[in-house]
Amino acid sequence: LTLLLLLLFQPAAFFSQTKLIIRPQVDDSLTARNSCYPFKFQKRPRVALILSGGGARGATQIGVLKAFERHNIPIDFIAATSMGAIVGGLYASGYTTTEIESLALNTNWDEVLSLTEDTKRTELFVDQKLQEDRSFLVVRFEGLEPVIPAAVSSGQRLTDFLSTQTLQALYHPNPSFNDLKVRFRAVTTDLISGKRIVLDRGSLAEALRASATVPLVFNPVKKDSMQLIDGGLVSNIPTDLAKKEGYDIIVAVNSTSGLRSADEMKAPWQTADQIMGIMMQQPNEASMKEADVVI
């Protein structure tokens, strides 16, 4: 009231001689900020999503991601293997579920996963086409020793596809996969040591390619002294990665296909896939026991 009277009756004197500074006392602590609300803010549980391998069946994991979005459930961490790594890696790098679904439906997977010569015939010179037409089997030699390929295909088309998609993503490793929209881990197997190798930094495309490298079908991804292939050999459902980092809720998605019948094993890579399926059965069951939710 006194201040109001001074302003009304002695404005000139007041403003010429007095500087009024008002400093409201503000407590920046979380407790003080929340004290005016009739409820307390609670820290939400951290959610980890674990995606298994499973070949084409891995595309069903897109539906799981859609369900998370539909119910507004945030995902804090993704650890994945093989096809799950491709789906999870694209999502972690900023792709929407609609965009991933569009890729799954519109990509010519027969071409991307082709086991034939990687160079398209339309890209060859005439003499190369003639040589290809005359060749039934091509064997390379190193000196006098024949060079036996490590796999049926180099997998270059798959590498190119993954490189293109990750380059177009909104988020990129810098260099850690923690820098992506969602923290991400790709699980692989070192063909030399037999150990599980968890990739958490570097080239995302290379990590996805390594995790999805089916033995005998695609060449291993060489990284340092390692030769990386499908992580499903040793850790198809890596729930332990989320448990180790202390996530509150672990959701595991198992899209692993069942074992093939005798009539379905007509090619070497189908036999190799069957062997992998047998090897993964018991570890899969143990891994799923560590999850809070299994889909």
PLM region spans:
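Patatin-like phospholipase
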Residues: 15-81, 89-295
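Bacterial Sec-dependent N-terminal signal peptides
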Residues: 1-22
